[in-house]
Swiss-Prot record:
Keywords annotated in UniProt: Amino-acid biosynthesis, Aminotransferase, Histidine biosynthesis, Pyridoxal phosphate, Transferase
Subunit structure: Homodimer.
Record-annotated disulphide pairs: none
GO molecular-function terms, A-Z: histidinol-phosphate transaminase activity; pyridoxal phosphate binding
InterPro entries: Aminotransferase_I/II_large, HisP_aminotrans, PyrdxlP-dep_Trfase, PyrdxlP-dep_Trfase_major, PyrdxlP-dep_Trfase_small
Residue numbers of N6-(pyridoxal phosphate)lysine PTMs: K226
Catalytic activity: L-histidinol phosphate + 2-oxoglutarate = 3-(imidazol-4-yl)-2-oxopropyl phosphate + L-glutamate
Top-level taxonomic group: Bacteria
Listed name of the protein: Histidinol-phosphate aminotransferase 2
Annotated GO biological process: L-histidine biosynthetic process
Record pathway: Amino-acid biosynthesis; L-histidine biosynthesis; L-histidine from 5-phospho-alpha-D-ribose 1-diphosphate: step 7/9
Natural source organism: Cupriavidus pinatubonensis (strain JMP 134 / LMG 1197)
Pfam families (alphabetical): Aminotran_1_2
Cofactor: pyridoxal 5'-phosphate
């Protein structure tokens, strides 16, 4: 029996937090795991052995170097961060989103993003006490420029997020629409920081990184998770040092551990291997999309990510039938009305994709 008085919890913990549910990660043991947009490929055995030796030299008894200078320099080199721009590291991009919300949390401040979109934009805003304003996409998941500009004028957001490509829809927003939003946020409509979230850039091969020098209100955020390093939890944001100097003030000390730093440095030294894996997944994406779309009643939406969004006649039923066949995907149909009967499927290895397509066909026929 618990010795905790529930009334004490009610007194201490915020009402909105008590009303929430914790982020749920489903058990994937024994399943073909296609729910979390992970890169299915590990490093080749020779590189794994080399990495193990490298990690064996890491001084676990010492705190990390707070500035992570070597890793930041390597990221700027490999990811072609423009001269004069800097990078700030986070324990995954989730932490960077939280830092942005915390740093911008003035009374009455708001965060804005198209919806459906990445759930952490809204969650981090709520945790920090900011209001989140979601602006619906069009029915085909394209960006509604007019609606965005009108909402920006009305709400005057502190931060506007644009995911490129978007999660969970997978599409790239029109570049002209995005530029109109960035320019409008420079003062003609509102004065806002625009954060372009490029978590899936390895699969999109499109980027706003080179535009950082064009706009003083622009940051570009990425993660190494989708490159095949989800287990080390490393995200980074690139932009003008004046912005990053402010974010650094709310960054937890030693937030990137020594094993993460060493692993990321090693992987960036062998980025050609990761690029090859991304190319394989892009090729598989086309094959899986064609296989899914071959079934009547199934609509597969264009994707520039390592996952596919599809609308099926009955999302809940199809999800359950796939799970019964040991295939785990993501049922996103309850996330937003625009996602009615939609499922999100991670693109994986040829073998796992074949298992999925076979199970998918059978699930539609049951």
């Amino acid at each position: 029996m618990s010795v905790v008085d529930p009334s004490l919890i009610e007194r201490i913990i915020r009402d909105d937090v008590r009303a929430m549910g914790a982020y749920h990660v489903p058990d994937s043991h024994g399943l073909v795991k296609l729910d979390a947009m992970e890169n299915p490929y590990r490093l080749p055995p020779a590189l794994r052995s080399e990495l193990a030796a490298r990690l064996g030299e890491v001084a676990l008894n010492r705190y990390p170097v707070p500035s992570s200078e070597a890793l930041r320099a390597k990221l700027k080199e490999v990811m072609q961060v423009p001269a004069g721009m800097e990078v700030l590291l986070g324990n995954g991009s989730d932490e960077i989103i939280s830092m942005l919300a915390l740093a911008a949390a003035r009374p009455g401040a708001k965060v804005m993003a198209p919806v459906p979109g990445f759930v952490m934009y809204a969650m981090s805003a709520q945790f920090a006490g900011l209001e989140f304003v979601g602006v619906p996409l069009r029915a085909d998941f394209t960006l509604d420029r007019g609606a965005m500009l009108a909402a920006m004028a009305e709400h005057q957001p502190a931060i506007v997020y644009l995911a490129y490509p978007n999660n969970p829809t997978g599409n790239l927003f029109d570049a002209a629409d995005m530029e109109a939003i960035v320019r409008a946020a420079q003062g003609s409509v509102c004065r806002s920081l625009v954060v372009v979230d490029e978590a899936y850039q390895p699969f999109a091969q499109e980027s706003w990184m080179s535009r950082l020098t064009d706009f003083g209100n622009l940051l570009v955020m990425r993660t190494v998770s989708k490159l095949g390093l989800a287990g080390i939890r490393l995200g980074y944001v690139a932009g003008d040092p004046q912005w990053l100097e402010q974010l650094d003030k709310v960054r937890p000390p030693y937030n990137v551990n020594v094993l993460t730093e060493a692993t990321a440095l090693f992987a960036l030294e062998h980025v050609a291997v990761l690029d090859e894996q991304a190319a394989q997944l892009r090729a598989e994406r086309s094959r899986v999309a064609e296989g899914m779309a071959a079934h009547g009643g199934v609509t597969v939406f264009p994707s520039a990510a390592n996952f596919l969004l599809a609308r099926v006649p009955d999302a809940a039923q199809t999800f359950d039938r796939l799970l019964a066949r040991k295939v785990l995907i993501k049922n996103v149909s309850k996330m937003h009305p625009l996602l009615a009967n939609c499922l999100r499927v991670t693109v994986s290895t040829p073998e796992e994709n074949a298992q999925f397509l076979e199970a998918f066909a059978a699930s539609l026929q049951d």
